[in-house]
Design a protein with these regions (language model features):
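Generic, ordered loop/turn and secondary-structure boundary motif
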Residues: 41, 54-56, 70-72, 122, ...
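Conserved active-site and cofactor/substrate-binding residues in soluble primary-metabolism enzymes
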Residues: 48-58, 74, 78, 82, ...
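Internal maturation/activation junctions in enzymes
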Residues: 1-44, 48, 64-124, 197-203, ...
Length: 302
């Protein structure tokens, strides 16, 4: 399907029937760009020569939680390796089959492949919301409960895997409502809840509560299967201004250690998240707010 989409883009940007054989001559290529599509010349040429794709991932953390696997640990590492080994092997098999049916990409003639590049881990927060609120891309959940605002109104989004665990505790309806209010008032965290055991608290840690070294480690492990790049975001909780200097020093050292580790393990990082992108509404406290939109790169958003 993706190869069809790519071909549709190429055919709408250039007149391939007139261009004839694959050409490496960019000036000759420019002559056959369709009227009104001049702005797409370079990207169409790249697509025409490489036919690169960017298969990614979505719901990594959601799957771990559904299987009761903490994000931090060797079980998550094992699934991470298994999942991306599978994706890469199937993608490689598919591009070879397409090459035999439709031909190779010109820039990699003789490789037996239809596409020069296959995988790229892009952010897809919007798609995650559409797909039943699953976790975006390879990222951990920012909160277990938050208010999602749309043009048609606001509604509360709850972590469905946490909801299942809470319902198994035998709570009454009013008690369950109070627990969710408590979670909302704690910025989506469950670490303070006595009703959950230590393992359950580990499973439902939010992005800012995780040791960021594990995000880097998972990304490092899967990089061998990703021929392009990963959008790797890191999440940090700034200490309050009233905290002692030692706390601030430890925070800065932690941030430095994570980035130093990332520099040695990864070829790039994406966003440095120091505050929640989607603020959790504390229904018990009325606080004046300024609406600050969380900006994403539209070009690479899934």
């Amino acid at each position: 399907m993706l190869d069809n989409v790519l071909q549709h883009y190429i055919d709408n940007a250039i007149d391939t029937t007139q261009l004839g054989e694959y050409s490496a001559n960019f000036k000759r290529f420019q002559k056959y760009v369709r009227k009104g599509k001049e702005g797409y010349t370079k990207s169409a040429y790249s697509a025409y020569r490489e036919r690169s794709l960017g298969l990614g991932a979505m719901g990594f953390h959601a799957y771990l939680q559904s299987r009761k696997i903490p994000f931090e640990g060797i079980y998550a590492t094992g699934f991470n390796h298994k999942a991306f080994t599978f994706i890469k092997s199937r993608a490689t098999q598919a591009t070879k089959e397409l090459a035999s049916e439709r031909g190779e990409a010109p820039d990699i003639h003789g490789s037996g492949k239809r596409n020069a590049n296959l995988m790229a881990i892009a952010p897809n927060a919007s798609s995650g919301i559409i797909c039943s609120g699953t976790s975006p891309s390879i990222e951990p959940y920012r909160a277990n409960c938050y208010t999602h605002k749309t043009l048609s109104g606001s509604y509360q989004v709850k972590n469905k895997y946490l909801e299942k665990v809470l319902k198994s505790k035998g709570l009454k309806v009013k008690e369950l409502e109070d627990v969710w209010k408590d979670i909302s008032g704690s910025e989506g965290s469950v670490q303070h809840l006595d009703i959950l055991d230590d393992k359950e608290k580990e499973i439902f840690k939010t992005a800012n509560e995780l040791n960021q070294i594990w995000i880097v480690e998972h990304a490092h492990q899967r990089q061998q299967f990703v021929c392009q790049a990963q959008s790797v975001n890191l999440f940090f909780t700034l200490p309050k201004a009233t905290e002692p200097q030692k706390t601030h020093d430890e925070y800065m050292q932690y941030v430095n250690d994570v980035h130093w580790y990332g520099m040695k393990k990864l070829k790039s990082l994406y966003y440095f998240r120091s505050n929640a992108a989607r603020s959790v509404e504390n229904v018990n406290v009325k606080v004046p707010r300024i609406n600050l939109e969380d900006t994403e790169c539209i070009a690479c958003e899934g």
